Regions:
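Aromatic/hydrophobic pocket-lining residues that form the small-molecule binding cavity
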Residues: 82, 141-144, 175, 246, ...
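A conserved active-site cap/scaffold subdomain adjacent to cofactor or substrate pockets
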Residues: 152-158, 162, 169
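Conserved Radical SAM active-site core
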Residues: 1-122
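Structural preference for beta-strand elements that scaffold enzyme active sites
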Residues: 55-59, 96-98, 118-122, 157-161, ...
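Catalytic cores of alpha/beta
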Residues: 170-185
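Auxiliary Fe-S-binding modules of radical SAM enzymes
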Residues: 183-270
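Glycine-rich S-adenosyl-L-methionine
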Residues: 138-151
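Conserved radical SAM core fold
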Residues: 60-70, 103-108, 119-138, 164-169, ...
């Protein structure tokens, strides 16, 4: 089970003070060291999920791409503050870190992370033609796929984050082609440890309006009369696909994964 850092208020009495500390942690080397040293075995034990095995996993890459954050502080004598944090956590036997990235510029991580098996990298993948509309100026999907082999060979655990899943008329062919490409390009070592995290498109109403104004092509893709977004039950100002559409396409995705990458498991899908 993965936990966001902000899910650990019991370590500190004031959850907001804790969140503020975490924000400072990823921007201040000395405070990050003090923070992770404060996480003793007793703190970690209360969050253990036996289904997850021996480790408690801290997610440090939900709101931003930390590989890019790392580049800001990287210089000739210092590999960057995110790598520094990863190496600190590796000293805690019960803890590991995880983050998602769209970047393929990961050589610094390969060279300087001391214990890569204690770091799970989630490579974000989507359809290439959708990337060219929704994620301009990010790494090509084929390059991200090829990066998986390199990271696994270096000792990292690498999962695939399929996100955002945008439902279109060509869904079955498009994702069949993507998963077939994965099967073709991944080496056996990468396949043996592969797992998926799958997230269907979800939008806040404010962000939806912003995209409509400043990214009309992306908005046009998301506004699909056949698969409309609608307010999510019990979630104020959140838009998603209807429960019926999502149920149908989750089943289709499961079938495609079993067909093209039967060795991979699905960690979660929503």
């Amino acid at each position: 089970m993965r936990h966001d850092l902000a899910d650990f208020p019991k370590i500190y009495d004031d959850v907001y003070r804790f969140v503020d500390l975490v924000k400072e942690t990823i921007s201040n080397k000395e405070k990050s060291r003090a923070f992770f040293k404060s996480l003793n075995k007793k703190d970690l034990e209360q969050y253990r999920d036996k289904k997850h095995g021996p480790y408690i996993t801290f997610d440090i890459g939900c709101d931003s791409d930390v590989t890019l954050d790392n580049q800001i502080t990287e210089h000739s004598n210092y590999p960057g503050h995110i790598i520094d944090i990863i190496n600190q956590v590796a000293e805690i036997p019960e803890a590991m870190l995880s983050f998602a990235t769209k970047s393929t510029e990961l050589d610094t991580f390969v060279r300087h992370v001391k214990n890569p098996k204690m770091c799970r990298i989630r490579l974000s993948l989507m359809l290439e033609w959708q990337r060219q509309i929704l994620e301009l100026n990010t790494a090509k999907i084929i390059d991200r796929i090829e990066a998986i082999n390199k990271l696994v060979n270096a000792g990292f655990e690498v999962h695939i984050n399929l996100s955002p899943i945008v439902i279109t008329k060509s869904f079955v062919k498009d994702y069949g082609d993507l998963l077939s490409l994965l099967n073709e390009k991944l080496n056996e070592k990468a396949k043996a440890q592969l797992a998926y995290e799958i997230i269907f498109l979800t939008h806040s109403e404010k962000l939806f309006d912003f995209v409509q104004q400043f990214a009309p092509k992306a908005h046009q893709m998301m506004v699909n009369n056949q698969f409309p977004l609608e307010p999510k039950p019990n979630k104020e100002n959140v838009l998603s696909y209807s429960p019926e559409d999502k149920k149908t396409y989750k089943q289709i995705m499961e079938t495609l994964i079993k067909k093209h990458t039967p060795y991979a498991r699905i960690r979660y899908m929503f």
